[in-house]
């Protein structure tokens, strides 16, 4: 009987240790994220939270073509051709220091893991850090995508009785990577997702920054919230956290041609 009690105690200790490790990993992951591009990204690394795919953090090294030495007509982080650039490539690359460059296609792959890597398991008793999902990467990640089909101004319906409805707009986000635009007449499903941008009473919001922008602009969005696909749809929806978490890089050349 004493041996069975000892085995039971060891099992309890083992479970307690595993739960403590998960909590520490979750806390570490949360503390590794920035709220805006003006903040310095975490330089640490936790191998237990890295994906099995070969993903590296910036800054990245790109070989510029002879006729475009400063990448005025191409954004290599998104592999997207530009008609007009708003932010110099060197500045974009500086913002990518210790951050992951993520495409819509890659984000679909990450969320398909249900917030887990081979070693990292999300604590379901805690709110998900990235909305309805937790991207199993230590530190910041940046989504690159082209804004499309921006809606008219909308207002939220469900608000407290003493609060005014919140302004917002919806749009599509496209992955105009030349890998896809050179092959497909119509973009495949993993290259398209939705975005919601809401007005905020606490400082300048992504809505304020993007409301007057035209369709076809290439965006870089830092650590956005991710929402599950709506019923009857396979498309994910993301929402930027603030104006500081969004960069408008330029106007995509191939927008409207796919």
Question: What residues fall within each predicted segment?
Answer:
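OB-fold (S1/OB) nucleic-acid-binding surfaces
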Residues: 107-117, 155-203
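A broad, low-specificity signal marking well-ordered, structured residues that form hydrophobic/aromatic
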Residues: 141-143, 169-171, 193-195, 219, ...
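OB-fold and OB-like beta-barrel modules that bind single-stranded nucleic acids
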Residues: 138-151, 173, 211-228
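Short alpha-helix capping/helix-loop boundary micro-motifs
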Residues: 128-130, 201-209
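Phosphorylation-prone, low-complexity intrinsically disordered regions
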Residues: 1-142, 157-167
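OB-fold/S1-family single-stranded nucleic acid-binding modules
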Residues: 222-257
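Generic structural motif
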Residues: 150, 176-178, 198-200, 224-226, ...
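Intrinsically disordered, low-complexity regulatory regions enriched in Ser/Pro/Gly/Thr
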Residues: 135-139, 162-167, 185-189, 210-215, ...
